[in-house]
Structure formats: structure tokens, C-alpha cells
Amino acid sequence: MAGPSFDLEIAHPLPLAGVDEAGRGPLAGPVVAAAVILDRGRVPAGIDDSKKLGAEARADLCGKIREVAHVGVGIATVEEIDEINILWASMLAMERAVAALGVEPAMVLVDGNRCPRWTRPSQWVIGGDALCLSIAAASIVAKEERDRMMADYDVHHPGYGWAKNKGYGTPAHLDALARLGPSPLHRRSFAPVAQFSLFPAA
């Protein structure tokens, strides 16, 4: 099957930004979004949906994307996730990512089935990270940025295995949650965490 291309993007005005997020499902850590404006004459080879790439290839591509593209990263905190829910926190992170580009896009393509509540021209694309190069590039940057953050958080909040599980609800993470209680970076609005929230970790 062919990978992502510019086929769905060429009908739109330039500059065009692709936007994607990483971290909707984990029990801990922020949700991170990236916005990428690619130079169509300088696209790194091998860009694909981040979920289809190995860690080494993804890290290499992230570096190459940052070298040749406009990149913006936006974060919604655990507190924001718990306050407004993960969907709207994801939208907020996307808004912040586009605002961080340093260039105002004429069009934004967003992975998923809805766009943030903004006034800029935009269109959502279901499965966009597998279809659109700009969105695929954003998926790589968002995933790399969030993984880096979770590895750093693992140093400061040891015991949960975040460097490995990235905050997802693996059996080992759930076991640690039961033993240690939630950390300040756990999403207390998520059911597996809420049941332990009466016993917050120090």
C-alpha cells in the first residue's frame, strides 16, 4: 500500500500545515500536538504514519523534518486534560502547535474527525497520518516530543516505567499504580487512575 503523499494537499493554498497529536490514550502525562509546514521541494524520504515506524527511524526522521520544515509543538497539561477532558485538551494542544509555527498557514489539515474551534481555514482528515505527508510529519514530531517528555518524567517519578510504556495502561503500569498510587502526572479523570486517587503519591 502506498504511503502518505501530497495528493490530498495540492488542492489547498500554501503555506499548508499538517497537524496531529500524540498521547490521547495514556493514563499519565500531557497530550502533545505538532504542526508541520513542509517545503515540497525538500521532503525527507521515508515519512510515514508514526505508528508504522520503528523508534530509530522515527527519531531520525524527526530530526530531518525539523531541519527543513516549519515546526510548532503544543502541549495540554494533565491539569487541563482533567479539567476540560482529553478531546478538548487535544484540540487545545493543536491550537498551540499551530500558534507556535512562527508562520501563519493559509490552510490546516488536521488528523481525525474534527478541527479545533478556531477561525483559520482547516479541514479534518480521517486517517490523515497515513494519507497526507504534512500530517504524517506532524505525527512523527508529536510522538517523538511526547516520548522524550515521558522519559524525562520517568527520571523524576520512578517506578511507573514511563520511559518504556509512555504512560499507557500496561499491566506493569497498572500494577505500579496500585502499589504506589497516582503521581502528580497521572490523569485523575481517567477511570483506572480515579480508583486510586484517594491515595495520592507523594
UniProtKB/Swiss-Prot annotation:
Gene Ontology BP annotations: DNA replication, removal of RNA primer; mismatch repair
Highest taxon listed in the record's lineage: Bacteria
Enzyme class: hydrolase
Compartments in which it is found: Cytoplasm
Cofactor: Mn(2+); Mg(2+)
GO cellular component terms given for this protein: cytoplasm; ribonuclease H2 complex
Annotated binding of a divalent metal cation, by residue: D20, E21, D111
CDD domains for this protein: RNase_HII_bacteria_HII_like (cd07182)
Enzyme Commission no: 3.1.26.4
Cofactor-binding details, from the entry: Manganese or magnesium. Binds 1 divalent metal ion per monomer in the absence of substrate. May bind a second metal ion after substrate binding.
GO molecular function terms listed in the Swiss-Prot or TrEMBL record: manganese ion binding; RNA binding; RNA-DNA hybrid ribonuclease activity
Keyword line: Cytoplasm, Endonuclease, Hydrolase, Manganese, Metal-binding, Nuclease
Entry annotated with the keyword Transport: no
Reactions listed under catalytic activity: Endonucleolytic cleavage to 5'-phosphomonoester
Domain RNase H type-2 residues, every copy: 14-202
UniProt record similarity statement: Belongs to the RNase HII family.
NCBIfam families in the cross-refs: PRK00015.1-3
Function: Endonuclease that specifically degrades the RNA of RNA-DNA hybrids.
HAMAP family with a match to the protein in the record: RNase_HII_B
Protein name from the UniProt record: Ribonuclease HII
Protein species of origin: Rhizorhabdus wittichii (strain DSM 6014 / CCUG 31198 / JCM 15750 / NBRC 105917 / EY 4224 / RW1) (Sphingomonas wittichii)
